[in-house]
């Protein structure tokens, strides 16, 4: 039943992308994904995670990165070149983060589509000053990655809804000329969590998006690309 449900979601995802409104945007040739464990996490035995893709999809092809890539491939008729990086260290220590040094490979990649999905590992933003500092760091991250090019930038809100973080991400996205993708409603559907699809020994892994949640994230990102 789960396999059938996922296949239905995948068909919907691909058809939605294939019927996106036509825009002047040329097909994306290079796509950069920056995120945390939801974007990519290597095997880690002590938390019972054996994958090397977005946690906690059941397979590489079912995480949001690969679903978005598949959707773009269907629309363009050719697969874009992709780069996927986990920047959880930026979330945890964004102040003074050496963007130019630590993310040199990502900058030199010169992506024409940049998708940023961060925030979940950020400590709580307890004051307006902390929120402003995070916003400033994310704005610097985005502008450095764009490096003066007219890249399309998507900034996704947190999967685990958090108003303070999401507001900072939205403002940073606007400051860098990006598009903010609000997925906060997904957190209210228990079916979007991996724990609803199969058992996990580690509660943290189980709290990540499962196949349904990953498909919903991908659908939101692809829909945002269809908006002028």
State what each model feature region is:
Residues 1-10:
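Bacterial N-terminal signal peptides that target proteins for export
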Residues 22-24:
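Boundary at the C-terminal end of the N-terminal hydrophobic targeting segment
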Residues 27-32, 40-128:
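Conserved SGNH/GDSL esterase-like catalytic core that processes O-acyl groups on lipids
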Residues 51-59, 126-131, 155-159, 203-208:
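Second-shell loop/turn segments in exported
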Residues 99-100, 130-139:
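Charged helix-capping and loop-helix junction motifs
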Residues 115-123, 141-171:
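Active-site segments of SGNH/GDSL-like serine hydrolases
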Residues 158-228:
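Catalytic His-Asp segment of secreted/periplasmic serine-dependent ester chemistry enzymes
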């Amino acid at each position: 039943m789960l396999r059938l449900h996922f296949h239905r979601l995948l068909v919907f995802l691909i058809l939605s992308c294939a019927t996106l409104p036509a825009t002047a945007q040329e097909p994306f040739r290079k796509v950069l994904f920056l995120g945390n464990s939801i974007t990519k996490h290597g095997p880690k035995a002590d938390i019972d995670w054996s994958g090397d893709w977005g946690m906690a999809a059941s397979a590489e092809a079912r995480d949001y990165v690969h679903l978005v890539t598949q959707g773009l491939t269907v629309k363009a008729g050719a697969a874009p070149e992709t780069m996927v990086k986990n920047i959880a260290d930026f979330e945890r220590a964004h102040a003074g983060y050496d963007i130019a040094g630590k993310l040199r490979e990502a900058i030199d990649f010169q992506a024409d589509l940049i998708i940023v999905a961060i925030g979940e590992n950020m400590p709580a933003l307890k004051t307006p000053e902390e929120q402003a500092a995070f916003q400033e760091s994310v704005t610097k991250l985005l502008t450095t990655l764009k490096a003066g090019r007219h890249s399309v930038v998507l900034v996704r809100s947190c999967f685990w809804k958090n108003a303070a973080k999401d507001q900072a991400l939205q403002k940073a996205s606007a400051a860098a000329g990006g598009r903010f993708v609000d997925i906060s409603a997904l957190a209210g559907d228990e079916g979007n969590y991996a724990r609803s699809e199969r058992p996990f020994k580690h509660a943290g892994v189980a709290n990540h998006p499962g196949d349904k949640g990953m498909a919903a994230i991908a659908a939101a990102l692809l829909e945002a690309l269809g908006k002028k």
